[in-house]
Design a protein with these regions (language model features):
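Bacterial N-terminal signal peptides
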Residues: 5-16
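Extracellular/secretory pathway-exposed regions associated with glycan biology
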Residues: 21-112, 116-216
């Protein structure tokens, strides 16, 4: 650490530089990583504990989650983190979260996504990698785009935090012809009547769900 600077001063500089990388987004509530209360319309995040010195996202299929959390949006700006996950684990470094969920597109077209994180993250839609922001790094934002048909689509955001103390995780979306805003599953809910649902991909929803009847 350079001499002559306090930790607080260095932290302020780091946060200022990090925020400068992010586009101006409309006001949105700051969220936590999630809560243990189940949200059937939100993102489910499975939490995994990592070995120290992990420098990339793990292969989740080889790990066992220690618990799950739920959230409708990921809007965690650069900050220090020591809270852990109440009700799941007190780990605040060397952990990963694998978020999975669905969202409904009413207006088909080219959608732009922005994923900012400290440390690594990736975005998949319908099992296609849209953004690769992996690795150990201070906050950085990466943009990706994908053409989406109308209907239900699968979304996955994988994230990991390496060494303490700072972290961040922000997912934003720009609908066709619009500016970026925080992605929220609450704004992409399907019609109330499942009979009216359409599917961008015939594998987007579990086939063992008796409430789902596919519309051709």
């Amino acid at each position: 650490m350079p001499t002559g600077y306090t930790l607080a001063a260095l932290c302020c500089v780091a946060l200022s530089l990090a925020r400068a990388q992010l586009p101006t987004l409309p006001d949105a509530p700051i969220t936590t990583f999630g809560v243990t209360v189940v949200d059937p319309f939100g993102l489910r995040g499975d939490i995994y504990l990592l070995r120290p010195e992990t420098n990339r996202l793990p292969k989740f299929e080889k790990l066992k989650p220690v618990g799950a959390i739920y959230t409708s949006a990921l809007n965690i700006p650069p900050r220090d983190f020591s809270d852990g996950f109440p009700g799941v684990t007190d780990r605040f470094e060397w952990f990963a979260i694998d978020y999975n969920g669905y969202f409904y597109v009413s207006n088909p077209g080219i959608y732009r996504f922005l994923l900012a994180s400290d440390d690594g993250s990736m975005l998949y839609i319908d099992d296609k990698r849209v953004i690769d922001n992996d690795g150990i790094h201070p906050i950085q934002a990466v943009e990706g785009r994908i053409t989406l048909s109308g209907g239900i689509h699968r979304i996955r955001i994988s994230y990991f935090q390496g060494p303490k103390v700072f972290l961040a995780l922000i997912l934003a979306v720009a609908r066709p012809g619009e500016n970026f805003r925080i992605f929220s599953t609450n704004e992409f809910r399907p019609p109330r009547n499942p009979a009216d649902w359409k599917y961008g991909d015939p594998t987007n929803l579990p086939t063992n769900d008796p409430a789902v009847k596919r519309k051709k």
